[in-house]
């Protein structure tokens, strides 16, 4: 048995939460492998919207186990809030959620470092979510971090206090003004730890090995998007983890030969939150229309998302880096009513035409090259069968499949789990 992966192919916000929720019935275990509460995975069913930040998106399904892998960073305060909301919905977390001992903890001072760092950059800020993600991964690679398993060890509180002291010295070096009460922040953090201690901690790499041996079906859930990958994204406007398929191996402790299907999710157009290059960004009425109809606001930050045409150059880059085997297209319904739909097929870059992602998308000479297709006017939100979709919508799908050389197996036409079309 192999582990299947589900990954975003753009700058995040592709709709991974919904699709994980839709596919969970086919699996025994759902596992998050990287990122932290900077993620906002939105699920909608029975007319109610749910947003998850750290907990895997299979949590609402009975008899499904959800695992937070070692590659994830956890903020106990935000985690506590997630737990409380799920308890209100009568979700039995003790039976459905376990955590890797090797996952790192986000301390309150990690958030303060994030804030101080961003303030110190002025106009050159990268658009951090200010959740302390980057500083936590810095402590991880710097071998200073506090891990979930430390909570089971004697003297973890001393390690916590020492790390807080180091962080406070670092914050002072930024020479920016930040208001905070460290004692209140520590008190809130320590009280939130009690909620984590109610759950089971595991040696996740061993757990996954045994689960694979027993033939249990596992779906690994990525966070953010491939274009935010620390190595292969639009650096430095990226997140601090590997959001690509390789991150599932290191973030769960599974070998590459145990990876099965890789499901790549993309929107029918492109969005981005925060700073960073965006070659196909729209500043006109069409971009505003996409944002309004697509409800393009970050589930974590609430910030409006920038919108633009679909970019096949960056999409192919993500497909290649991840080894995608099947495609899933989200929000095709948002494009209804647009007369002409543009698709970026290449870039003019430093006097040449390129069909790959160059070293920097910020180069002033970079200009997208577009092809154009006829749009459709029909409302497709209630369509449940592919054959009943408008001809021009199907032409759009066929065009993308030809260009990307992959089948689009699932099409989402709305936020609810029922608004999903499966293709044979």
Language model features: what each stretch is:
Residues 1-424:
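Non-transmembrane, aqueous-exposed alpha-helical and coiled segments at domain scale
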């Amino acid at each position: 048995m192999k582990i299947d992966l589900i990954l975003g192919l753009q700058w995040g916000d592709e709709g991974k939460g919904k699709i994980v929720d839709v596919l969970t019935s086919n699996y025994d275990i759902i596992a998050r492998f990287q990122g932290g509460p900077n993620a906002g995975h939105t699920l909608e069913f029975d007319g109610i919207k749910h947003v998850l930040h750290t907990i895997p998106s299979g949590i609402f399904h009975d008899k499904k186990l959800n695992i937070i892998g070692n590659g994830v960073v956890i903020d106990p305060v935000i985690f506590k809030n997630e737990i409380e909301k799920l308890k209100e919905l009568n979700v039995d977390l003790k039976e459905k959620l376990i955590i890797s001992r090797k996952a790192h903890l986000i301390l309150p001072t990690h958030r303060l470092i994030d804030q101080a760092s961003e303030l110190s950059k002025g106009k050159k800020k990268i658009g951090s979510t200010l959740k302390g993600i980057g500083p936590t991964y810095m402590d991880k690679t710097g071998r200073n971090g506090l891990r979930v398993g430390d909570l089971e060890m004697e003297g973890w509180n001393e390690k916590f206090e020492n790390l807080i002291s180091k962080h406070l010295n670092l914050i002072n070096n930024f020479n920016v003004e930040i208001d905070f009460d460290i004692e209140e922040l520590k008190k809130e953090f320590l009280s939130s730890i009690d909620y984590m201690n109610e759950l089971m901690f595991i040696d996740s790499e061993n757990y996954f090995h045994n689960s694979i041996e027993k033939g249990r079906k596992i779906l690994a859930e990525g966070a953010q998007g491939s274009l935010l990958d620390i190595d292969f994204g639009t650096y430095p406007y990226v997140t601090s983890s590997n959001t690509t398929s390789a991150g599932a191996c290191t973030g769960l402790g599974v070998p590459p030969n145990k990876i099965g299907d890789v499901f790549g999710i993309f929107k029918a157009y492109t969005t981005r939150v925060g700073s960073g290059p965006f070659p196909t960004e729209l500043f006109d009425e069409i971009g505003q229309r996409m944002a309004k109809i697509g409800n393009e606001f970050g589930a974590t930050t609430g910030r409006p998302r920038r919108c633009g045409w679909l970019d096949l150059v960056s999409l192919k880059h993500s497909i290649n880096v991840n080894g995608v085997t099947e495609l899933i297209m989200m929000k095709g319904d948002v494009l209804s009513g647009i007369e002409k739909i543009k698709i970026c097929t290449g870039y003019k870059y430093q006097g040449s035409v390129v069909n790959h992602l160059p070293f920097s998308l910020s180069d002033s000479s970079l200009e997208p090259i577009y092809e154009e297709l006829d749009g459709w006017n029909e409302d497709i939100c209630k369509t449940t069968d592919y054959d009943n979709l408008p001809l021009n919508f199907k032409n759009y799908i066929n065009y993308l499949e030809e260009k990307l050389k992959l089948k689009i197996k699932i099409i989402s036409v709305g936020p609810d789990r029922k608004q999903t079309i499966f293709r044979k």
